[in-house]
Amino acid sequence: TPRAQQCSWGWLLKQHLDGLAASAEGLMCPEFTVSDEDGNQVTMSSLKGDILVLDFWASWCGPCRQEMKSLREQYKEFKDKGVRFVSISLDASSDKWKKACEEENIPWLSTLADGGWDDSEVRKLFGIQSIPHIVLVGKDGKIVGKNVRRNLLRDKIIELLNK
């Protein structure tokens, strides 16, 4: 109802549904901007051309930190085969993000989304409600998997490489 849409819960639900609709499998990955460890802007359009593994995480997320081991293994396996890994942190503090990157020894591009968890436009754009959350993007820029992890991620990457 229009009344429900105007209340705070209705507004939040609409935002979430809009994010899910804009980043559904089969659609072009939405354009976004994040910052690398040197403060340089990284955009989706600058990443196109390779298979992309977009890893949404945060330093305070225990399961995200555990997922890094699997991602490191897959990075080693696929880094020279046209697969690019990009971590997108939803930390509010750039210091905590940078410290976590050092602790995790992340060898791929690590970026920070403005706004932290609460106010990140990138999180809202992808309709992310929990992390870790991995989005797989094909060479053509279309989303081919959302919330794919570990063996499922590996299988989907192999499938894309064999096309």
List each model region and its residues.
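Conserved hydrophobic packing residues within short motifs/helices of P-loop NTPase cores
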Residues: 54, 86-88, 111, 135
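Structural microenvironment flanking redox-active thiols in thiol-disulfide oxidoreductases
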Residues: 66-104, 115-124
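Hydrophobic, well-ordered secondary-structure elements that form the walls
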Residues: 54, 97, 110, 141
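Thiol/disulfide oxidoreductase modules built on the thioredoxin-like
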Residues: 104-106, 113-162
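Conserved redox-active cysteine motifs that mediate thiol-disulfide chemistry
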Residues: 48-49, 55-73
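Alpha/beta-hydrolase fold active-site loops
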Residues: 51-52, 132
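N-proximal helix/coil linker or "cap" segments that precede and/or mark the start of modular domains
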Residues: 1-35, 40, 45-50, 76-79, ...
